[in-house]
């Protein structure tokens, strides 16, 4: 089974091919996750992407999903994890602290590749 972990950052799962923009020892392909030219059509059984998809805007997201579909086998699985809006509302109601929810909703992540900063597009 061929499994991809897209936008893996520091997480290294056994038996996954890791793709991320950052250069870390466990990264197999240092690349953006919106284009996967190093994989052929219908080559991948499983794509896992946790808290990276929200960095694409609506137009980009459509193209990204097309690309991921291209590399997935016909019965392949796409597993996405994105911010849980309902959970964030509950946190706000419980704490009354807007700063606890702004990061996950409109967060930013600075990366060590030049002057790059990634912002959520949600």
Task: Report residues per predicted region.
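A general structural motif
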Residues: 1, 44, 73-75
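Class I SAM-dependent methyltransferase SAM/SAH-binding core
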Residues: 2-37, 86
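Conserved Rossmann-like nucleotide-binding pocket used by diverse enzymes
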Residues: 17, 29, 48, 78-81
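A short acidic, Gly/Pro-enriched loop at the edge of an enzyme's catalytic core
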Residues: 34-47
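A short beta-strand submotif of the Rossmann-like class I SAM-dependent methyltransferase core
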Residues: 46-52, 61
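S-adenosyl-L-methionine-dependent methyltransferase catalytic module, highlighting the catalytic core
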Residues: 60-73, 77-122
């Amino acid at each position: 089974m061929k499994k991809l972990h897209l936008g893996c950052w520091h997480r290294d799962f056994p038996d996954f091919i890791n793709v991320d923009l950052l250069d870390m020892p466990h990264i197999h392909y240092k690349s953006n996750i919106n284009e996967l030219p190093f994989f052929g059509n219908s080559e991948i059984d499983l794509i896992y992407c946790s808290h990276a998809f929200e960095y694409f805007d609506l137009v980009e997201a459509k193209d990204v999903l097309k690309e991921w579909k291209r590399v997935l086998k016909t019965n392949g699985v796409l597993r996405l994890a994105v911010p849980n809006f309902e959970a964030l509302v509950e946190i706000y109601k419980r704490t009354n602290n807007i700063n606890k929810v702004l990061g996950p909703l409109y967060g930013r992540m600075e990366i060590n590749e030049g002057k790059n900063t990634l912002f959520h597009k949600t």
